[in-house]
């Protein structure tokens, strides 16, 4: 069967930069799914996109569907003939198949013999299927917001102007979004505005590049990266390439040209983060640092044209950025006229959540939690309390209202200016750490206390009003808050009891609609986040389940047990001991054992049970100090030595002895074995 490349390109006015790549990938996936559903084979599908086009190229596309062998079943043979003559049922079936009764066959099945007909159905030509496939793919695109244009009732993200559909060298006759398919595309709006007729689908990328368009998203992104780095090198600086900004800029240009501009050094008196946010958010500029990591009065802009006069483009950008940076300087100067502490009253008019009060209420709650945590971790409770009082004050400053991503950062700057203790100032920024899984945790005790308190307050409050996350909905980012708490406690090695902290946090809220069982619900939710954490660490979920089966409420202790059980699970003895513990659990459960672990050595009869009893006693003496010191890995190493005695016991000893006293004693021996392992985890869970 012959195979040929397919090209589909939809030309439009400038699309939203954030939507370009998702739309192109969705178009690719929609066409690929349509082809697969139609049983048309192809080798691969690739997505391309620029601000003015979405395109898909399918390689090795078969020219038709495969032929299919069809089998139709008619009436039962007994009903198909009477006295050797075909009945109306047989004749009607033959007519429906377009043949005579003589052309029909007998089909043998488990339910008897039937009249049937077999024939081969030719596959439909791919070009006949493509219009509907492409139309469905386009209609299914996740367009953020549709619009209409002109007198047409057609809707799309932006007005569309051309449609290319080429199967090899041939145009596929089709109409999509009111556009008739052809072979004519467009190049760069300014460098190559004339129409471009494509002779073949394979010509697409080269033809566009010759017309100053890089259609490949990844290639365009890397071209920008290379140019930005090269410009930085020329200026003896380091370019900071934010990947999100790189993606956005890539969605704004078809033919990237990086240029370096400058701004007045007087703006460097403004905190660097403010200037960077302004350049990034307003103008999509990349900033440059000197060898010491200090912001330089330079920026890199990515133009969409190769100008004959690059300096004019640079000067235009410098003219545009000047008032933007002046605004940032104005916000900074205005904010500094008022102390952070004086803004606390303004928090009374900012609602945190309708049922949970204002930001002033939240600040009061986290003050109590922060000071408690600080005292528990050896920090300064007064510093933690002061940090909590000021924690949300920068949210009502001009700078943060303009650039919300600077929350905490500006609080630190303003607190330092106000003469607050350095730990207090630093905590205002640290309260938002970690921002993602691999991010740093706070470095100061006040920062640790504040970061924990803020998240615990949010978790208990939102759960307490019955708005816990469900499915994909998590409007208050509770998953991130829970993971943040776990990360802080584990990475900072804070051995705090999460239940105790949650009880304190819940108490600060007073009456909550869902107060009953609140602490247990939040605790379970948070500890369940360890499941994803273990998977990210490459640890089997059975290890998580083994630890989760125990009533462990200290996340640091939980993590230590996870690592210890993971190491144990790699040992040769682990499989046998996990199986043995599962067997023990089943036996004790079935016999409804009372939990007694007291073994009467006088009732030990078999050598194997005596050996196991002695081994358990020795292990208990060796393991107890290790458990008390939370040295779980070493404890499990000791317990691994029980494999031999345990195997011998189950091989040589009948647990369910006829003598009731002996039977109870053996059950107690098994309960003693189980309880020793349960000091760390339920390793029976490893046997899944």
Curated annotation (Swiss-Prot):
Record's keyword terms, sorted: Aminoacyl-tRNA synthetase, ATP-binding, Cytoplasm, Ligase, Nucleotide-binding, Protein biosynthesis
Catalytic activity reported: tRNA(Gly) + glycine + ATP = glycyl-tRNA(Gly) + AMP + diphosphate
Gene Ontology MF annotations: arginine-tRNA ligase activity; ATP binding; glycine-tRNA ligase activity
Compartments where found: Cytoplasm
Keyword Calcium part of the UniProt annotation: no
GO process terms (BP): arginyl-tRNA aminoacylation; glycyl-tRNA aminoacylation
Keyword Aminoacyl-tRNA synthetase part of the UniProt annotation: yes
One family name in Pfam for this protein: tRNA_synt_2f
EC nos: 6.1.1.14
Alphabetized InterPro entries for the sequence: DALR_anticod-bd, Gly-tRNA-synth_bsu, Gly-tRNA-synth_heterodimer
GO-annotated cellular components: cytosol
Binding partners and assembly: Tetramer of two alpha and two beta subunits.
Family assignment from sequence similarity: Belongs to the class-II aminoacyl-tRNA synthetase family.
UniProt cross-references to HAMAP family, sorted A to Z: Gly_tRNA_synth_beta
Record protein name field: Glycine--tRNA ligase beta subunit
Species name: Chromohalobacter salexigens (strain ATCC BAA-138 / DSM 3043 / CIP 106854 / NCIMB 13768 / 1H11)
Taxonomic lineage of the native organism: Bacteria, Pseudomonadati, Pseudomonadota, Gammaproteobacteria, Oceanospirillales
């Amino acid at each position: 069967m012959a195979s040929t490349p397919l090209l589909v390109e939809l030309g439009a006015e400038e699309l939203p930069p954030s939507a370009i790549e998702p739309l192109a990938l969705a178009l690719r996936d929609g066409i690929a799914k349509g082809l697969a559903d139609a049983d048309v084979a192809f080798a691969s599908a690739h997505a391309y996109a620029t601000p003015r086009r979405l395109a898909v190229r399918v390689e090795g596309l078969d020219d038709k569907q495969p032929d299919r062998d069809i089998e139709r079943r008619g009436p039962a043979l007994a009903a198909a003939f009477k006295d050797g003559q075909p009945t109306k049922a047989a004749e009607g079936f033959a007519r429906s198949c377009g043949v005579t009764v003589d052309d029909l066959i007998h089909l043998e099945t488990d339910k008897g013999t039937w009249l049937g007909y077999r024939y081969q159905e030719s596959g439909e030509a791919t070009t006949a299927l493509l219009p509907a496939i492409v139309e469905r793919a386009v209609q299914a695109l996740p367009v953020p917001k549709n619009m209409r244009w002109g007198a047409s009732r057609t809707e799309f993200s932006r007005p569309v102007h051309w449609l290319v559909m080429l199967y090899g060298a041939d145009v596929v006759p089709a109409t999509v979004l009111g556009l008739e398919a052809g072979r004519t595309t467009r190049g760069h709006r300014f460098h190559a505005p004339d129409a471009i007729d494509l002779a073949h689908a394979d010509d697409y990328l080269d033809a566009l590049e010759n017309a100053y368009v890089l259609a490949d998203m990844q290639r365009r992104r890397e071209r920008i990266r290379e140019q930005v780095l090269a410009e930085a090198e020329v200026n003896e600086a380091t370019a900071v390439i934010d990947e999100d900004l790189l993606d956005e800029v890539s969605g704004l240009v078809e033919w990237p040209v990086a240029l370096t501009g400058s701004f007045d050094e007087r703006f460097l008196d403004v905190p660097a983060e403010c200037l960077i946010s302004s350049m990034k958010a307003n103008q999509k500029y990349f900033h440059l640092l000197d060898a010491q990591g200090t912001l330089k009065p330079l920026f890199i802009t990515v133009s969409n044209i190769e100008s004959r006069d690059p300096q004019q483009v640079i000067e235009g950008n410098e003219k545009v950025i000047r008032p933007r940076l002046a605004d940032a300087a104005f916000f900074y100067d205005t904010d500094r006229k008022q102390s952070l502490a004086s803004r606390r009253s303004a928090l009374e008019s900012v609602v945190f959540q309708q049922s949970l009060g204002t930001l002033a209420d939240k600040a009061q709650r986290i003050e109590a939690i922060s000071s408690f945590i600080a005292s528990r971790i050896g920090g300064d409770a007064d510093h933690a309390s002061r940090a909590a009082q000021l924690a949300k004050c920068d949210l009502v400053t001009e700078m943060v209202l303009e650039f919300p991503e600077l929350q905490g950062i500006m609080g630190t700057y303003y607190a330092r200016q106000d003469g607050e203790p350095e730990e207090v100032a630093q905590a205002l920024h640290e309260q938002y750490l970690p921002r993602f899984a691999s991010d740093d945790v706070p470095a100061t005790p006040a920062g640790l206390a504040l970061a924990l308190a803020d998240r615990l307050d949010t978790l208990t409050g939102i759960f307490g009003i019955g708005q816990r996350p469900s499915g994909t909905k998590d409007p208050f980012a509770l998953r991130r808050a829970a993971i943040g708490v776990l990360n802080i406690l584990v990475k900072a090695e804070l051995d705090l009891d999460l239940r105790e902290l949650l009880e304190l946090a819940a108490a600060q809220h007073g009456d909550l609609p869902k107060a009953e069982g609140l602490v247990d619900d939040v605790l379970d939710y948070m500890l369940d986040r360890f499941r994803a954490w273990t998977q990210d660490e490459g640890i089997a979920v059975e290890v998580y389940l083994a630890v989760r089966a125990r009533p462990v409420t200290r996340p640091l202790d939980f993590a230590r047990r996870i690592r210890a059980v993971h190491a144990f699970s790699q040992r040769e003895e682990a499989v046998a001991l996990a199986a043995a513990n599962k067997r023990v659990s089943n036996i004790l459960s079935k016999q409804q054992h009372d939990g007694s672990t007291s073994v009467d050595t006088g009732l030990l009869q078999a050598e194997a049970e005596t050996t196991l009893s002695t081994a358990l006693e020795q292990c208990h003496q060796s393991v107890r100090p290790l458990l008390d010191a939370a040295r779980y890995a070493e404890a499990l190493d000791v317990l691994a030595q029980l494999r031999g005695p345990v195997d011998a016991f189950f091989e040589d000893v009948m647990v369910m002895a006829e003598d009731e006293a002996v039977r109870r004693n053996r059950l107690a021996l098994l309960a003693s074995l189980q309880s020793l392992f349960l000091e760390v985890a339920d390793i029976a869970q490893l046997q899944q």
